[in-house]
Swiss-Prot record:
It comes from the Bacteria. This is Putative transport protein bbp_117. Pfam families: AI-2E_transport (PF01594). It is a multi-pass membrane protein. The keyword Transport applies. It comes from Buchnera aphidicola subsp. Baizongia pistaciae (strain Bp).
Amino acid sequence: MQNPREGMDLPQVIFSLVFIFIMIISSLWIMRPFFLGFAWASMVVVATWPIFLKLQILLWGNRACAVVMMTFSLLLVFIIPIVCLVNSLIDNSTSVISWLSSDKFRFPSLEWLQDIPIIGIKLFSSYQKLLNEGGAELITKVQPYMGKTTEFFVIQAGHFGRFILHLIFMLIFSALLYWNGEKVQSVIRHFAIRLGSKSGDSVVLLAGQAIRAVALGVVVTALVQGILSGIGLAISGIPYSSLLMMLIIIFCLVQLGPLPVLIPAIIWLYWNGKTTWGTVLLIWSCVVCILDHILRPILIRIGVDLPTVLILSGVIGGLIAFGMIGLFIGPVVLIISYRLISSWMDEIPAPNSLSKKSVQQLLFKKKN
């Protein structure tokens, strides 16, 4: 019997593997500038693919018009608001820095503290004592750091050229994926089937459902909370409400919620004696926070029938591990792992559940 290893040329195998490895690394290195844009485009296209198909039907089956409309919609949703936000931040930075560094920056009197029952007068006297004894020194120490901190954030916001470039790549790749969506899906599913047979195909379909669930449950909820919070801030008279609204949306995406922005805004209103508007914003903030616990689980269930805790854990962990793109990568990885483990366990039937009486009988027999 002939040994199959006799015809194996070991140096040829080694050089072939080294060559394949070098080609893969070189290809990845060449495509490295496009990874982030392509990843975002993939997530956006998968999340909005049902909308794209419905739009194509409304346009009498014209794929080109549907691609143009969806790309233009993405342009309106992503590029224009971000450019306007950064320009507004840069334009208003000079006045903010000068105000923080000037002598006009003073702590308010907080006379409304006296109206608080029982402890109001004591709080007001303690606050006035703090201002009289150490307020000036505190302001002197805080002012340089506040100005420098604001300047740092403004400088970082000014370097948004690379970010805009990634967004442009995202738009280009999104248009290409919309145009060839079925072909790309077929190639990915074929590759998955080659790796894992039928389970590989189900993993690809599950990944698409997970991305849509995150887009519906997390992104849509963050947008709704941000818009409602921005309306409340604007009505209450909070300055720079549009900038704060964008900040709230970011906080909601990273699962911190709107309270890190709304609570300081409420304190600022009470601080400046606007108790009525402070109370209004407080009630509105409670409504916005309650909406998060109602809307998000419903939207996630629409996208995929999986545990909400699993998706939210993936969102938070993915953000910490991969940044903003981890918002989608984290849930996809956890959900795929969850389904693979579940399907592997389901290959063997689960043990029969025993009643309390049966368990006691078994324990009694063992003792005897």
